C-alpha cells in the first residue's frame, strides 16, 4: 500500500496511461516507457530509484537473480483483467481510436519489437522463440514466451521478488527451544498424553508417519504398476482406488459419522463448526452439522493420507467448500506434528544424560511440512484467514499473528481499482476476484497460540506459493542463487485450481515436481538424531500426500497425479464422465461439423492437424463468401504457426493473442466486425484472461477442442451478438483426434464421444438451436 501512496505523489505531469499504471502498480511500467517513444520514457529513472529503495528495505533472504533472457521475457508482463477500462467493450471507432492513443497498457505480455510496430509486427515473436529455445527445452521456452498471462507484477527483474522475512520471532516459533508445557500452558500434559496414548496410536497421522517401509516395498512401489478398483460414493460419484501394495486398495464412506473418528487436534474440533457454518444447509440433519456432503467424503479420503485427485472443483459452487476442507486437514497435520516435536523436546530434556533413543525421531530434514500451490495472492489471503479462524477459539482468545497488517497490504486488494461497469461471466468474476498477482511465496509458522507470517522457509511449517513464485526461487541448472532444500521433507502437497496453471505456465508445475522431496544439499542445522529414518533413506516421496484439485480432466494434470505421486498408501481419483456436453448450452441455430483427424501417434498430432487444416479445411473458407471467419486456437505454438502461414499466403486476416496490445485488439475487432478482414485468429489464453465478446462471427473454426468445455458454448453463442439476419449461413467446424477423448466428451457427452471415435466415418454433424 505504501508503494501506491508513493506512486500517487509522482502522478503529476504524467500521461493518462502512466497515471493509470502508477495507480494500479505503484510504479511506472518499464516496457511501456522504453518503447513508447515519448518524453515520459525518462520516468525509467524514477522506477530505478524506487526499485533500489525497495531492495534496500528487503531483508537478506531477498532473491536477487541475474537478468537472463527468461527474466527479460517475464519483465514484459502486463496488467490484470481487472485493470481494463470501461470502454473496452465499446465498438465505436472514435473510442477505439482514443484507446489506441491513450490506453496502450497491457493485454498480457508485449514483445519490445512488437510494441514499436504495433499489431502487424508480431512476426518478431518466433524470432525470440528461437533465441530462447536455443538455451531451453521447448516446454520451457513456451513458458518463458507466455510468461504467465495477466501478471500484475511489472518488476523489470521479474525473477526477484521483493521479499520481507520476519527474523524477530525466530526463538518464539522455534521447535527446538520450545516445549509442550510452555506451548499449551497445561501442567497435566503428560498425564493427558498417557491417558490418550491408545487413541493416539489409532490416529491416521500417527499410523501414516510412523510406518516404516521395507526396501522390498519401496522397490515394489517404484517398479511395479498399480492395481486399481472402482467404487461409487453418494456425493463424489465414481472413484478409482489404485495402489501398488495390495493391502491398500479400497475405502468405503462412513455410514455413521462421529467427530471423534476425525482425530482433530485442539482447538479444531470446537472452531471448525463455526468456521464452516456458512456452507452448511439449513435443512441439514444435526448429525451432518460438521461437514457438507462433499466435504465429508473428501475429508474421509484426506484423513487416510491417500493421494486425492478431484477434477470437479468449481469456483462458483464448491470452490470455497473444498478450500476449507483441505485447510482443516493441513492445519490438523501441522498441529499434530508440532505437538509431537514439542512433547518429545520435554521428554528429551528430562531424560538422563548419555541415553539415546530412536523414539524421538519425529522430524524431517527440514521443517516445512505442507506446501500449498495456489494461482493468485487472493487465494493465499483466504487460506491464511481460514487458518486464523480455525485457531481462534472465541472472540476473547485472539491468536497473535505477526506481520498481519503487512500481509493484508501485500495480498489484499483495493475494490476501487476495479471498473464499476466491467461485465464478465460469473465464473470469470469468481476466478479473478481480489488480488490476482501470480508471483508470490510466503512462509507460515504455527504454534497453538500464535502464527508467524513471512517466516523464513527453513523456519516455516507451511509454504503458500504460486508456481511462478516457486520457479524463481528453485531456479535452473547453473544459476548461483537457487534453493530447493526446503522442499526435501514436504509431507503434504496441495495443488489447488490446477487447471489455471495450464493457462499460466505448466512448465513451472513440472519444474516444482522434479525438485520436491530431494535430499538437501546442506544440513541446515538439523539434529539427525530427531530425523525419521525414511527421510534419511531418501524415501520422503513415498510418504508425501498429494491433494490435487482441478476444474477439469486433462492429460497433463493426470500425468502429474500418475507419474509424480508415489504415496505408499495409494491414490484415489474421481472419474465421473460427462453425460451431456457443453454443446447443449449453445442457443443459436448452428450446424456443428466435427472432422476427425487420423494421427499415427500423439507426437504426430500437431503436424497432422496443421496439414489437415491447410489442405482440407482452409480451402473451403478462402472464398469471399465465407467472410467473418473466427479461428479459435488453444495452443500458442499453433497460433504462431498459423499466423506465419497466413502471412506467407497473403490471406486477408487479423489476429489477437495474449501478447497483443489493446490498440491492436481494438483494430482487429473493428476490422473483423466490418468485414475488412476475412479471418480472425484468436488464442484460448486471450479468451481465458479477457473474455471479450467478439462480434461479427459468421463462420467458426475450432482448430482444436477448447481446454474448458464451457468455452465452446461461449464462443458459439457469440454469433448472436451480431444482429445481421444472416444466421442461416452460420457454420461451425471442429477438428479432433482420438487423443482428444476427454475434451470431446466434455463438449458432446460420453455417449456421442464413443460413437464418434469408433465410427468409420470421419465427419459428424450436430445441429443446435430451435427452428424459427
Curated annotation (Swiss-Prot):
Annotated localization: Nucleus, Nucleolus
Basic residues bias spans: 14-23
One GO MF term attached to the UniProt entry: U3 snoRNA binding
Ranges of Basic and acidic residues composition bias in the record: 24-37
InterPro entries on file: P-loop_NTPase, UTP25, UTP25_C, UTP25_NTPase-like
Sorted UniProt keywords: Developmental protein, Nucleus, Phosphoprotein
Region of interest (Disordered), residue spans: 1-208
TM spans (from-to): none
GO biological process: embryonic organ development; maturation of SSU-rRNA from tricistronic rRNA transcript (SSU-rRNA, 5.8S rRNA, LSU-rRNA); positive regulation of embryonic development; protein catabolic process; protein destabilization; protein localization to nucleolus
Region feature Represses p53/TP53 degradation, mapped onto this chain: 651-712
Tree of life domain: Eukaryota
Gene Ontology CC entries for this record: nucleolus; small-subunit processome
Statement: the UniProt record of this protein carries the keyword Transmembrane: no
Stretches for region Promotes p53/TP53 degradation: 1-200, 588-650
Chain positions with Phosphoserine modification: 58, 92
Feature: compositional bias, Acidic residues: 83-108, 117-131
Modified how: Phosphorylated. Phosphorylation is required to promote p53/TP53 degradation in the nucleolus which promotes cell cycle progression and liver development.
Known partners and oligomeric status: Interacts with CAPN3; the interaction is required for CAPN3 translocation to the nucleolus.
Family statement: Belongs to the UTP25 family.
PANTHER family, sorted: ORF PROTEIN-RELATED, U3 SMALL NUCLEOLAR RNA-ASSOCIATED PROTEIN 25 HOMOLOG
Function: Component of the ribosomal small subunit processome for the biogenesis of ribosomes, functions in pre-ribosomal RNA (pre-rRNA) processing. Essential for embryonic development in part through the regulation of p53 pathway. Controls the expansion growth of digestive organs and liver. Also involved in the sympathetic neuronal development. Mediates, with CAPN3, the proteasome-independent degradation of p53/TP53.
This protein's name: U3 small nucleolar RNA-associated protein 25 homolog
UniProt organism field: Gallus gallus (Chicken)
Gene label: UTP25
